[in-house]
Amino acid sequence: MKLKKRYLLLGSTLTVSAALILSACASSQLNKGVFFTSSSADLLKNNSVPLSMFNVSPTSSFFGNAYAGLTNYVATGTNRDDGVNVTDQIKEKLVLELALSVTGYKKTTHSGLKGRAQKNGSTDSSDGSSKNDYTKFNEWDAIGTIYRDSSKSITEDPNYHKITQEATRYEFTINTSLSWVDNAGREVKQNNQPVKLSSKDFERGFETYILSSNLGFNRNGYFIDLMGLDVEKTVGMDKTNGSSDGNGKGIEITDENYDVENYRSVDDNKFNVYLTSPFPFFLSMMSKEFFFPIPHTHPKVKALKLGKDSPLKYNQNNNRKILDQANTNFDGIYGGGVNAWKDTWSVGPYYVESFNQAQIVFKRNQIYDAIITPNLPKTRQENEKPIPAIVSYFQPGATPEVFYSSYIAGGLSASAVPYSQQQDARSRFNGTGDLRWLKIQKTAQSAQVTYSGKPYVANDSTVQLNANITETEAKFLYNSESEEALTIRAGINGLINWKNLAIIDLPNSGDVNYSTVPFGIFKEKPANGTSSGTNTDGIENDYYYKINNNQRLGLIPEQTGTFQKDKNVLDTATVKLSYYSSTKTNGAQVRTASTSGSSSQTSQVSSKQVSVTKQSFISALKKVGFTGNNPLHFNIKLGNASLSSNQVDYYNALKQALTELGNDNGENLIIPEIILGDAQGPTRNEWYIGLSSVLGFSYWSPDYDGVGTWLDAATQLNSEGIGEVITYNSGSHIVRTLLLAASQNNVFNQIENKLQNNTTTNGKDWCSCITSADLFKDDPYVIKNFGTNGNNGTSASLAFTKKALSLLKFLVDNKVLKADKVKEAIKDPDKYLSKRSKIDDNKPANVSDIHIGYELKDLYDNAAQLNRFNSIWAEQDTDNAKFLITVVDSYFPVLPVSAPGLNETIPSLLKPWFSLRNAPSGIATMRDSGYIDE
């Protein structure tokens, strides 16, 4: 998908969200008009690729809102504190930035007009392009228009909800009065005329992002599938009448004959984006740097294609083109690296004045401030100006302690305060105005640790172990649905006192995120009991992730036994859960009556209560086959190249806790190891995607709003139904849960009939006839999230089952699952559910079986769309989201992670003449921050 934007266009983007690690190299005297900062990331680690493989720029993560998009988030208000506590916080608004308006459309229901459009083909565009203009012939009904408004967020517009729920075409009116500027902040001119922002700049931006992904260079290409982008209509080109393949057949972006100057966009001020179906997060997603514009008339932008004279080189691998990084000329790529920066352009609030091995310098874009800033919500106070310049030094591997010392020495404008230096900071900066207090309102992005999804790999037609994974470890990973594997994962999450460990890493932690969806994102029902859905009346709720009165709350139910507050291993605690399995009926058919007749199942599903204790945890390890001589190597791979002293202490304590938890009378069944990595560089694909080491590895979860988007990241499958790098087969586990719900013998017959006569109506059509469903009645997670005040397990099981049936229908209706195969599966659930549910010597027999979740592949009509429709369904109703979170989190696919808590105040240092505006996630938005020129 697209190679994009200004820094490195051809880049793989692992957006390292480090709440802006504010630090820098020592300098005896600060220039008050310059904001001095520093990054610990090694942005130039490998000069053979563009700036450590960020798609747009390595600075897009460390300099929030230095660039501009169709939409963006603006931070308004001021952070205030009383010297200890935060008294007022920044508010965040989603706004139109480079677009003046956006209109949402849905396909017209008037068949006559639609037929006219199809008959004519709409191929005659005003500029002679051979691309179809899909906006013509009134195929579309306008849903509504949102106009740029400096007083409010576009989410407050009365049309917002309807547009985002129904639109499959978005037409942005581009602000073509804005000029591109060069590295001196001057208007770029071609043919003596200023180069203005154009719809083609956005189309070219999308296009290079798609190309980058298709070449295997950008690991964030999943955004295209997630939003459901109709690539051909948005950026594709068609072959001409003279082509051997016939008129109208699309040419792939990776084809050397792809014409990058053949645009879908006909008018410079209109950019149309087409989706295959509505996606509620689309306008929010357009604030991501992947979709920012690049200047389509720039010679190096025109060169971003495959072909004889292209700087891009590729190898052919199984009929797929893969970027050849060793032979690609990155200096010939727009924004490709240090040597390519001297001729880059900008339309954002800052432009890059200079860039070398030691530092990068940003200057404020005066043209942006003249045209765009007055039309955005007001951010700065009357005595503040935009920060004129930003200088960031590169200090790879530097720790917070180094940055703190640099601030004291006068080399930095801002710095975090390490926990070990908080008392020093209080005394040293008392009354100076430097010490500020922040409070995180929500998590924008977090690094979680999950389990390897690739215990086996294929070597031609032979199944072999993945590198560094033992046969026993592969058995544990592969049979993830077994009682033993579930017990081990639940024990690691539930028998370690993660809260106690998190305290070690203060101020970078406070609460513990036990869930795939972190605090501050989930919207709970308001007090009146009505569902908030995607509306803004929900209450920010972090109830999953807190420990109150020494009891753990949320998706890990309260434990029995003593919590043992100051112990890292809770060896007297019990974590209760339900284990689900299927069994054949030994030839006897189970007949279930219904009003329309009767049908038979050849296997049944059942549940079993499991109590996870230290003893049962050890027993499960032994049952899998782990011993002192053949231990579980629990390798946690991190993206960090270095750790702070607090983090070193945290991970050492975690290693000790894992070792203690796995100790069986002096025999260590678990050997933990923390492996530092590199969040940048060409080896990252192997580091994360290759999963060439054992059990734990770090991944970045999403950094955009919506509970559904976080669920999407946890349930992603590819077109073959295989779990992607960040999922550990949670997607297939959800499908298994849906089959369990529909296979209950008092539910099966009704659903079989519904599948037989399915029509695309609403989910209630499959639920209204169900009056009893007891399979989940003892599940503590189901009771906690779907039970009544009396914790009635029967009613909770029924409510949970109805949600499962609603999602099952939604996935069938949207052609993610095949109705006939689902019918077959619930008639004989054991055929699908027993494949990886037994630990005893169960391993893949052939290469088609090596992937976790392979047993469900025949059910999918379009497996790659599972995560997308999970996220859409989750946003339709709060209880939908709660259902998916319950299913995923009770499967324990990720380890708990410490993070800045909603109730933690975090000290930081900032020179008194600056006013930083941090987004609710804690990330500084440089565009909105202020400078006080005294």
UniProtKB/Swiss-Prot annotation:
**Secretion signal span:** 1-24
Where a lipid (N-palmitoyl cysteine) is covalently attached, the residues are C25
Matching entries from PROSITE patterns are given as: PROKAR_LIPOPROTEIN
The alphabetical list of record keywords is: Cell membrane, Lipoprotein, Membrane, Palmitate, Signal
The places in or outside the cell where this protein is found are: Cell membrane
Lipid attachment, kind S-diacylglycerol cysteine: C25
Top-level lineage group: Bacteria
Annotated membrane topology is: Lipid-anchor
Q: Which Gene Ontology terms of cellular component type are present?
A: plasma membrane
Segments for region (Disordered): 111-131
Q: Where is the composition biased (Polar residues)?
A: 119-131
**Which InterPro entries does the record cross-reference, listed alphabetically?**
DUF5396
Pfam families, per this entry? DUF5396 (PF17374)
Chief location bin: membrane
Name under which the protein is recorded: Uncharacterized lipoprotein MG321
